[in-house]
Structure formats: structure tokens, C-alpha cells
Amino acid sequence: MKIKYLLLAIAFVLGSFSANAVKIPVIVKDSTSPFWQIVLDGGCTAGAELGIEVPLLGPTSEADIAGQINVLEDAVAGGADAIVIAATSFEGLGAPIDEAAKSVPVVVIDSIADSKNHASFMTTNNVEGGRMGCQHMVDLIAEKHGAPEGEVAIVNYGAGPSSLRDRIQGCNEVLDSYPGIELVATKVGDFTTTRQLNDSLDLITTFPNLRGIFDDALFGGLGTGQALKETGKADDIIAVTFDSSDELINYINDGTLKGLIIQDPWGMGNMGVKGAFDAMNGKALPAFTDTGATLVTADNIKNADIDAKLNPSLDCKP
């Protein structure tokens, strides 16, 4: 995946918009993440197609809830006509989105907040994605050991985002349906790769008979992949993660990881902006749009449709 870093206005956008253009900012959770770079490119492309301004905004960490609230408030004050946002926190962004929606239509993508005032919610069905990932993990455990039995663990990127909660919920639903599978730990991170690595190393050390790890986000997969490399446990532990990056693709190709659940981040950004444009022009939007999820394995990673999702062309210039 060739990531081209977009020029981002990260924090303060008040007064930054052109006087007469329609302006629909896209506010993501972490402007430095490869996943969110793809979302921003999708939004940028929609803006180019519609002939509108699409400022590409966001804090530099998913843990910076206050920073995202500031970006949202400044975007409204700066003259946005509608807003697209992925909420860093279900609880923390509820009231700010309620307030923003008093002035402009708000389309939420990826992760919802505790608000009923958004025009639409466009995201992966994350519960189903969690089911998909953990079902694949359990299936491979059964294939390897002759039965769906053994110890498994979950590595959570961090508390707060609804998308991560939903993925864990879906995973737990699958695990609960197998009496022989024991969930020995759920590690809750702090939105850093270092913590994800340390959590995975701790799991591997603490549970020598561990047979599976499910990561609910890209950086968890990076941490687990590195941990499996360092400990030489890639053949013993079935690891599946959400999202993709160049390194995660390499981990699939060399067998370190056994599955990726990939989303459509470009589509989220693109559909989000187009939906927000329709909403500002008085059109009713569906309450929920499932943007889809796909299981990627060593068996299908070379397929043309999978390759197109893993390596989107990020050509938009804001």
C-alpha cells in the first residue's frame, strides 16, 4: 500500500476556508495513520468531483479526544456547510456532535458517538467484522489441532471508540459459541504501537499454550506481528487483525499473521462527503450504510479485487 501523506490542517481551522466555496471538512481520529490517510483521500476525491472544498483535519492520536473536539468546534465556527467525522470516543464526542448538528449536517463515519443528531452513519459492520476475524481464527485452530479448542486472547487498541467495542463484541460472540475455546485475557491498550507490542509479548510469555490472538486494529496487528517474530511463535499462534498496511501485508505473505479483516476506508471518506453534500442540500440519507469488510488470507491476497482494496491509488491533491 503506497501511502501518500496529504497536506493536513491538523488543529486550528478557523478562518482557513475560502469565502464562497462550499466547505465540508473531513475530521478523522489520527491524521498520521495509514488507514485514515486513505479515508482522507476518499474525501478529497469526492470534493474534487463535486467542486467543493474538503479540508482534511484531525488530531495526531486517537487518544486526543479533546483535540478532536477542538477541531470540530473550529470547523463549525470557520464556516463549514456540513461535516464528516469519525468519533474518537463514543461518550466524549456525543455532546460536541449534538452541538455541531445545531448548525450544520453531520455525517459520522467509522465510529459513532453518543448522539442521535447525525444525518447518517457510514461504517463497516464492525460486529460482523469481529465475528469474521475470530471465526477464521477458530477455524484455523481447529484445522491445526483437530478441534476448536485452546486458549486465545484479544488485544484491544484502546478504550473508547465504538468500532473497537463492536469488533470485540463480535469476536466474543464467536468465542462463546465454542465450549472448548477459552478466552484467557483481553488486553486494553493506550493507542500506541509500543503498548500493543508489549501486550502481545506479555500474552505470549504468560500463556505458553496460547493458540490464537485477535487484534481489533491495525497497530495491534503490527505489535502482535513483531511479537511473534521476536519470539518465534508464528507457527504456534494463529493471529488475525483488522485493517492493513505494507507491513501487515508482508506478515500475511510470510505467514506471521493468518488473516486481515480489511475495510473500505476510501469509500467511507468518499461516501461521507457525498452524503454530507446531499444532506446540506436537503436530501434524506439512510440512517446506516454498511461499507463492507473482507477477509484477506495468504490464499486470496493476490486476487485482483483484494489487491485493489489493499493498494488504493491515492492521487488526490487537496
What are these regions (language model features)?
Residues 68, 122-149, 195-197, 244-248, ...:
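Hydrophobic alpha-helical segments within soluble ligand-binding/sensing domains
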